[in-house]
Each structure stands twice: as structure tokens, then as C-alpha cells.
């Protein structure tokens, strides 16, 4: 939620300080991503008949763990970079947010959807090709390999050095999804 005309690129909007408080579990929330915690009148108070889940979801002082990772700038603009459960750790200790890489890859030619996973301490892109675009272009398997090689090279010029993707695997079927449409990441680890 924000004010009309005051949006910042890659933000989810400005934090409006009514009925809810937000903070990030980070020593430097303006520069280092942390988990978004929320508290207030509009935040639910717990899981129905599930004390254990409620205790795990809240801090001792009542802040709800959203599972979202992000930052907030000095103007109270929120930037979400991923989910706690999907964050990967590089071999040199850098936090890697696969969703950021996937957004770039998903906008490349002939990519319908992608998923970044870690295998043997290297990042691997699982790619579902856009079958309709391939058919329209009359592209065969050999050309698909050339296209995806070019996509990988272009991707690795964009991402930070610690987020370089070492290889890709073509997936012939769309990824399994949750009812809300999120990829079931745990199935591809």
C-alpha cells in the first residue's frame, strides 16, 4: 500500500503506519535483507486450536514471522526479495534469493518458467521451455540448446558473481504447483 505516484522500482510499496507495525529481523534493514515481522490489530492472533504452530509463528513479544525476506529504505518503502524457506547460501556465505534470478530467466526467450536449485554447491536452473513459442518459431531440440546456452550466458552477465548459474536442465513438464500457483520447490531439490 502506498501513495499514488510515489512507487519505487522493485518495491512492494510504502509502509503505511496504520493498524500494523513492521520490522525486519536484520541489523541493517536498509541494506541487509531480513525476515519481515508484523504486529498489530489486523494481524491474526494465532492458529485455531494449534498452540504449537502459533508459538512457532510468533516471537515471544508478539511479532508474526511472515516468511518473507526483504528490506525497508529510509522512506519506509518495502522491498521483498524472496522467502526464508527458498533462500540459498553460497559456498562463500552469500545469501542467494532464487526468485530474483528466476524473474530474470523467466523473461528470456523461450522460457515459460524456471526454478533455481543448489546441487553440489552450484546453482542449476531448471527450465520449462515455452512450447507454444518453440512451435511458432519451428525450433528443434538442437536450436533449443543453443537458445538456452545463450540465455544462460546472458543471465550470468546480469547476476552478481556469487549468483552465477553453472548449468541448466530442461524440464518437459510444467512444475508442480500449490493451489495458489506457487511452485512446490521441495519437489525439485
Identify the role of each PLM range:
Residues 40, 45-46, 55, 69-161:
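AMP-binding/adenylate-forming catalytic core of the ANL superfamily
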Residues 113, 121, 152-189:
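Conserved C-terminal "lid"/linker of ANL adenylate-forming enzymes
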Residues 1, 66, 90-91, 178-180:
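Ser/Thr-glycine-rich phosphate-binding loops at phosphate-binding pockets of nucleotides
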Residues 7-8, 131-136, 176-178:
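Short, charged/polar, Gly/Pro-enriched secondary-structure boundary elements
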Residues 1-78, 84-86, 102:
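Conserved AMP-binding/adenylate-forming
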Residues 37-38, 48, 95, 169, ...:
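Short aromatic/basic micro-patch
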